Design a protein with these regions (language model features):
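Active-site mouth of glycoside hydrolases
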Residues: 2-164, 169-177, 188, 332
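Domain-start "cap" segments at the beginnings of catalytic or binding domains
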Residues: 2-5, 12, 16, 227-239, ...
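Generic structural signal for residues positioned in beta-strands
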Residues: 10-12, 190, 307, 319
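A short acidic, often aromatic-flanked loop/helix-cap motif at beta-alpha or helix-coil junctions
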Residues: 18-19, 199, 316-318
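Catalytic domains of carbohydrate-active enzymes, especially glycoside hydrolases
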Residues: 30-52, 262-269, 298-300, 304-309
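Active-site region of glycoside hydrolase catalytic domains
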Residues: 104-250, 257-282, 296, 303-309
Length: 334
């Protein structure tokens, strides 16, 4: 499997140009040049920058993004430019499925936006990669998403044959959806997934999961049988089947290796890089338990050369910048 060179150790700048107030003051102040310098000094090689379509409805939107890319280049950081939300579609509960996959008009706005982005940024292909859309939700969108993604790749390829284009699948970029990505692959396509498994651990106490008790806490090395029992009691999704051989076991690097095995095999067969664009642990979790999770998943990322960008640098309920990470941050980054 080919490595995604230059995009091996990354961090998300979530909440800056996406999932935010969409006001100039926020765009100007949430992240600055010093933050690019800091993540470079920490040891990251790239930043994933989520952007919502609203950014480009701001008269200064492209200016803000230009400045971000200039700062990344200044500090020798590569960038994944991720379209996090588009017209008529968001992965967020309550915002989401507002006609994008059914409306040719909304799809045309998606193509028009990527046409603008491609024209403006393919000249930066030495350090910028494009991610077409964040977290397609339902499997029912699989076929139409493949059509949209394929058409968008062809559009971008009119401007550049070598810029890296990152494509994920349904169930919020689940690793199990890699097998159903069906586009006209070329050597500069990157297969993308996200991983927050076991969700009951990484999202313990998460307020946005409606059935999650806000005071719920769980240690990482809980048996899978208990994970399943608790998840069932609270009606919380838990995708562990492909990673578990014995329900008496607890999470380990082998769990993640089993979970990723099919996607790794597909990437090897297609000779394409595999990239985990989001993964992380909510800030409510005990910091030593958090470290255990990161060390296990990183062992598998390193073994197979899987590029990755943890979620997220500042705030956003994950807050890797927070001082609670000061003693262990270097152990996580490696």
């Amino acid at each position: 499997m080919r490595r995604f060179n230059g995009f091996i150790k990354g961090i998300n700048f979530g909440g800056w140009f996406s999932q935010c107030s969409n006001e100039d003051e926020h765009y100007r102040t949430f992240i600055g040049e010093a933050d690019f310098k800091k993540v470079k000094e920490w040891g990251f090689d790239h930043i994933r920058i989520p952007v919502d379509y609203e950014l480009f409805e701001n008269s200064n939107g492209f200016k803000y993004l230009d400045e971000a890319l200039d700062n990344a280049h200044k500090y020798n950081l590569n960038v994944v430019l991720d379209l996090h939300k588009t017209y008529g579609y968001s992965f967020d509960d309550g915002e989401g499925e507002n006609g994008f996959f059914e409306s040719e008009k909304l799809q045309e706005k998606f193509y028009e936006l990527w046409d603008k982005l491609a024209k403006r940024y393919v000249s930066r292909s030495s350090y910028v990669a494009f991610e077409l859309l964040n977290e397609v939700t339902d499997i029912k969108y699989c076929d139409i998403w493949n059509e949209i993604a394929d058409k968008t790749v062809k559009l971008i390829r009119q401007y550049s044959k070598d810029i890296k284009i990152i494509v994920g699948g349904y169930h919020n970029n689940a690793v199990s959806a890699i097998k159903d990505i069906d586009i006209d692959f070329d050597e500069n396509i990157v297969l993308n997934f996200h991983c927050y498994e076991p969700l009951l651990f990484t999202h313990q106490g998460a307020y946005w999961i409606k059935t999650m008790p806000k005071d719920f806490r769980i240690p990482y090395h809980t048996s899978f049988s208990d994970y399943l029992k608790i998840a069932h009691e609270h009606n919380i999704p838990l995708i562990i089947d492909d990673g578990v051989k014995d329900l008496n076991d607890t999470p380990s690097p082998q769990f993640f290796e089993n979970l990723f095995k099919e996607a790794i095999n597909i990437a090897c067969k297609r000779d394409l890089p595999l990239y985990c664009g989001e993964y992380g642990v909510i800030e409510l979790t005990d910091i030593n338990e958090t470290l255990k999770w990161y060390l296990d998943i990183h062992e598998v990322f390193a073994k197979y050369g899987i590029g990755h960008a943890l979620w997220s640098y500042r705030k956003m309920d994950f807050d890797f910048e927070n001082e609670r990470y000061d003693e262990i941050r270097h152990k996580i980054i490696g």
